[in-house]
Regions:
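C-terminal helicase lobe
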Residues: 2-6, 10-138
Length: 138
C-alpha cells in the first residue's frame, strides 16, 4: 500500500497490483499511477474503486482552493473526464487512447468492460481479497 507521494518515488519493476480507493484527480494522474504495475512485462492488474462522494469531495476542494479561476475550471473539467472514464462501459484502453489523441478500432479484451458478459459478475471474492489487502496494510 502506498500513497501518491510514495508511489512517485518507487522504481520497482515487479509491481503486480495497483488499487485506487477513490477517483484520481485526472486521467493523466491515473495513467501515471497505474503505469507503475507490470513494468517488467508480466501480467498486472489495476483496480479503481470509487463512490459518487469522491467527485463531490474533490469538486468542493477545488472550489475552496485559492487557485485562479482558470485553474479551478481546468481542474473541474479534468475531474469530470476522470469520472466519465470510471463510469463508462466502453473499452478502457480505447478510452485512454482517445484521450491522448490515439485511435484503435479493436477492443483490448482485457479490461473489465471488454470482459463483462451478459451474466452478472459475482465480485464478492475479488472484493474480499481487496479489503483484506487494505486491512493488512493498516
Amino acid at each position: 500500500m502506498a500513497t501518491i507521494a510514495f508511489g512517485m518515488g518507487i522504481d520497482k519493476a515487479d509491481v503486480r497490483f495497483v488499487a485506487h480507493t477513490s477517483l484520481p484527480k485526472s486521467i493523466e494522474n491515473y495513467v501515471q499511477e497505474i503505469g507503475r504495475a507490470g513494468r517488467d512485462g508480466q501480467k498486472a492488474e489495476a483496480w479503481l474503486c470509487f463512490s459518487g462522494g469522491d467527485a463531490f469531495f474533490q469538486k468542493k476542494r477545488i472550489a475552496e482552493s485559492e487557485a485562479e479561476d482558470w485553474y479551478k475550471n481546468l481542474s473541474e473539467v479534468k475531474q469530470d473526464v476522470m469520472q466519465g472514464y470510471a463510469e463508462s462501459t466502453e473499452c478502457r484502453r480505447n478510452l485512454l487512447l482517445a484521450y491522448f489523441g490515439e485511435k484503435s478500432k479493436e477492443k483490448c479484451g482485457q479490461c473489465d468492460n471488454c470482459r463483462v458478459t451478459e451474466k452478472s459478475w459475482d465480485a464478492s471474492t475479488a472484493v474480499k481479497k481487496f479489503l483484506s489487502t487494505v486491512w493488512r496494510s493498516y
